Amino acid sequence: RSWSITVMPHLDAARAVLPAMLERGEGYLLNTASAAGLLSQIGSPSYSVTKHAAVGFAEWLSIEYGDRGIKVSLLCPQAVETAMTAGIPGGGVAGVDGMIGADEVANCVVEGLHDETFLILPHPEVATYIQRKTADYDRWLRGMRRLREQFI
C-alpha cells in the first residue's frame, strides 16, 4: 500500500508527461518526498523506505534527463501542518524542529523552482542533518537511535 501511494504516482506522472517534454526538448518535474527519504523515519519502516525510493527516482530522473532539457526538483519537508499530522502532538519525531504551514512550504517551492534547485528543503536544518549523516554515518546512526529512544 505505501509503495502505491508514495512511489508509483511519481512513476506514473513521469510516464505520462516525459514523452511530450522530451519531444519539446524541455520540461519541469516537481516530485514530493520527505526529509524521511533523505534521513529516515523513526517508527515507520514503510514510510522511510518508500520515501527513500521517491528520492532515488527523482535523482535518477535528473541524471537521466537533465542534459535533455528536463529539469527536476525534489521537495523534502519535515513536519508540515496538514491533516496527516493533525493528530500527532507537536508533529511527533518529524516535528522535532517545529511544524511549518503549507503556505511556507509553497513559498519554498516557488523559490526553488525559480532558482531551478534540485533539492528543496523547507526546513533548513535538514541540510545540516544530511551533512552530518554523510560525514560520519556511524555517528549519525547512533544519534538517530538516541532520538528514537525519546519517541518510542
Where do the protein language model's features map onto the residues?
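Active-site helix of classical SDR
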Residues: 14, 50
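A short helix-coil junction within the Rossmann-fold of NAD(P)-dependent oxidoreductases
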Residues: 16-25
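Residue(s) in the substrate-gating loop at a strand-loop-helix junction
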Residues: 34
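Active-site-adjacent segment of SDR/Rossmann-fold oxidoreductases
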Residues: 39, 60-70
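Active-site loop immediately N-terminal to the catalytic Tyr-X3-Lys motif
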Residues: 41-45
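Short, flexible catalytic-loop segment of classical short-chain dehydrogenase/reductase
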Residues: 77-87
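C-terminal tail/cap regions
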Residues: 91-92, 96-152
